[in-house]
Amino acid sequence: SGAGNGSRMQSNSECSGNRIITVTRLKVKGSDFTVYAQAGKALKIEKAVLKSRNIVRPAEYPLEYELLPKGKERHFSGRHQFSEEQQASGRQPFQIRIWGSTGNMTLWEGDWDVYLYTEEGEILPVILDGVTRLKLLFGNYEIPKGNHILFPMASTNHMLTLHDRLRASYDSTATAVKENVIYLFYMLTKPVWNRKKIWVIYEKYCTEAQDNGSYFFKYCMENLPEKEKKHIYFILDKKSLQWPQMKKYGRNLVPFMSARHMLYMLAARIYVASDARNHGFAWKPKPNIITRQISQKKMLFLQHGVTALKRVDKLFGKNGSAPMTYFAVTSEFEQKIVTENFGYAKENVPILGFTRWDVLENKARPDEKNILIMPTWRPWLEEQSDEVFRESEYCRRYRQLLENPELGAFLRENNVKIIFHIHPKMKEFLEAFQTENDQVKLIVQGSQPLNELIMKCSMLITDYSSVSWDVHYLAKPVLFYQFDYDLYQQANGSYIDMTRDLFGDRCLDQECLVKNIKEYIENNFKEKERYAQMRKEHFAYTDHNNSRRTLEFLKSRGC
């Protein structure tokens, strides 16, 4: 949290009790918000700010503040020098009032944190106390912002954060009432539900059914007796492109944000998912009673991709913001990364293999050669305007590649197509990649089965995407196009040295990339031997029994 604030920022755990700024009350009126907080001792405050977490588009706005020593009637505005007696005692708690108007700020989507800067050079986060966090669950603290919504929430370490996003259908009062009614019903009937041993399975945002979660769910539906599978549920949005083919599972398929969805999230014995707990409910919701309960549930993390190319321990680690109970991996190589960097005991990091790999087979055809280009998303570009995205290096580099005349001519000459697959978090920017190159086809993730694209492709071009492991698993060549490697390392980092340990050729510029593409086409997309040898270390199983192992693991843990 508070990325980019440097070493001066004091975390909740690093601050002594006297240095923690604790929020005791929040007030919202129109576009104005007021924070009432308390410090354990006198602080020489230099300024108060509202600061964006976006590292590529940094911004901060000054906030007004005043100090009031407890037991005193005077208020102090701006910078205040405390008396020698007050400073010497160091024990006199001080009240702080911080306020601002979002109507005078240009805020964009994402997280905005409140900080106090002291004259000693500290940057102190503002922490929500337990009572205030509880009030956020039941009160309406929404700050109106047109078709957007801005609201206070507790982020990592209970930091006060204002979150800005597009307004969604689940922001309604009706949804809030339904959540509270379902919660009350569950609490009154809790013993009944606890006996059912409910498993809840889902994938990214509950909008997809084509990752490890759905393949494990299908295995359970097709291989377990009725008594065992009756309380195994898959959550999916009715708007999902996979909804029609999943309807055959009847009541085991649960509509997203329905009353049953809310109830099963509360009653579940365990979640089994390819993404974190917050993907199992409304995304970035206003504080509510159900998400508070979700965060405390057991979870088997099936993962979306092999953990190696992107550091995620601050998110998924034992002490991270989204910790897991069990963390499924694919090999001893990956297990070592997780146990050494995430803080989990080895017995909670089982080597099971990915359930979606049970159905993988090489379907590449010599008469339908295609190169799948699948870049991952950039956190610093998420929720940005179309103008900001189009001006980014990310957009510019891929547009130049798709429109490269030398590459286009070579593809045409060899009858090779490019399928450019954009990440779902950037699907609104698909138009930015439109090209007149007739060898290029643009698609958004979810519009076609991803595993089919992987099985049918001749080669993959990516940057840091974990889908590269699926292609590596199938013994196909992978090219890594890492033009923004330094920025990626700054923002994310990795667990392997990507300058030497990747399982495919690496390029930093378009000239290198086009050269390698042409070489692979000329060699009929044959994987290089040195990369083929790495497969033994990277995959413990290729026996198509990963779902069975996953089921056996859950049963062994009494789930």
What are the language-model segments listed below?
Residues 346, 432-437, 466-541:
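Catalytic binding pocket for nucleotide-activated donors in carbohydrate/polymer assembly enzymes
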Residues 543-559:
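C-terminal alpha-helical cap of glycosyltransferases
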Residues 210-217, 355-432, 507, 539-542, ...:
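Conserved catalytic-core segment of nucleotide-activated headgroup transferases in glycan assembly
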Residues 278, 283, 301, 447-492:
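A donor-sugar binding/catalytic signature common to diverse glycosyltransferases
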Residues 1-198:
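Basic, ligand-binding patches in group-transfer machinery
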Residues 254-264, 424-469:
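Donor nucleotide-activated moiety binding/catalytic core segment of transferases
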